[in-house]
Amino acid sequence: MSLDFAMRPEWEQLRARARAVAERGVAEYGRWHDSWINGHSKDFSKVLAAEGWIGMTWPVAYGGGGRPGIERIIMAEEMISAGAPIAASWFADRQMGPSIYLYGTDSQKTELLPGMLSGEATWCIGMSEPDAGSDLASLKTTAVRDGDHYVVNGQKIWTSGAASAEFCYVICRTRTEGPPHRGLSELIVPMDLDGIEVRPVRDMVGTSHFCEIFLTDVRVPASNLVGTEGGAFKQTMVQLGYERGGIDRLVSNRPLYDLALEHADLSDPRTRQEIAAIETGYRLGRLMVYRGALGQGGADFSAGTKAYCTEHEQRVAQFAARVLGPAATVGEAVPNSICYAPAYTIQGGTSAILRNILGERVLQLPREPR
């Protein structure tokens, strides 16, 4: 298996162009911590669309660019490293669009994909619940068929961007008999339907991109079912692969690291050792992400990528807190980055769960007793 990641000239040109666009975006719309979840700007999404950077890896048949995954990784790396506001189109581009062109009906593809590609439509993902986080199969939100509709009742939490989203991709339970994971289905839920209440959740760093969603007798057209009824668990695992194998978690703290470097005492041996470890970590993390984008390692390899990159982010935050000292409490972005670090290894799949995936599916170790 090749580990030759020599950058092609066209990739370097893309990187330079993405960096220039990101810098202009930051100058106009501000620099954002975790810009892929906090930096909402539809105007900047339209800039990305004009560049062909939304849906750039989607098949040409569905309006996408048909470009290799490594090119999207390079573009995203520059955007997030700069703190450019890409959140408005991020979930649609990364997960919802691929889910719809893979599993959706022709009508769903025709109606929904163009809005994603233009940067007009905003999406969120209704997955986690108060009693169902890492164990997706235990979720309780129900969708009961009633003629040409599903009647949805339940609650979602930790839903990024729900307050501004026009659509929510909701995982719900359509069947109670049989194995729990086989009773799950995915519905496209317009957020303006009656019976939906969205409440922003103020997190420990003072931001409110997370929301909880309450669904009370929400009537969703049955035509909004994505894929097969009862097939959501498998479909969701594919979606999580897109999330876990991305560059976002590796470089979200890059602005914080750059700031810490400006204030670091390079005469201190401990500081030099930490910098060497972090720089090595960045390079290893990038190799893991690039390897996945080039189709090496298999689908389950993304679990290891996510586990490594989030733990690396935590090391960056710890380094910055030590180097900056009291200055780390000044402003908004720096305290947010440091205080939010403990959550990195929880959201999107805990490190413990990801290690189980690697052990059981990649190393073929015995399954964890349940």
Predicted regions and their residues:
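A short core secondary-structure module
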Residues: 148-149, 153-199
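Glycine-rich beta->alpha junctions and the first turn(s) of the following alpha-helix
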Residues: 3-9, 14, 196-287, 344
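Amphipathic, small/basic residue-rich leader segments at the start of a protein or domain
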Residues: 1-89, 111-118, 246, 269-278, ...
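A structural signal for short hydrophobic beta-strand segments in well-ordered beta-sheet cores
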Residues: 141-144
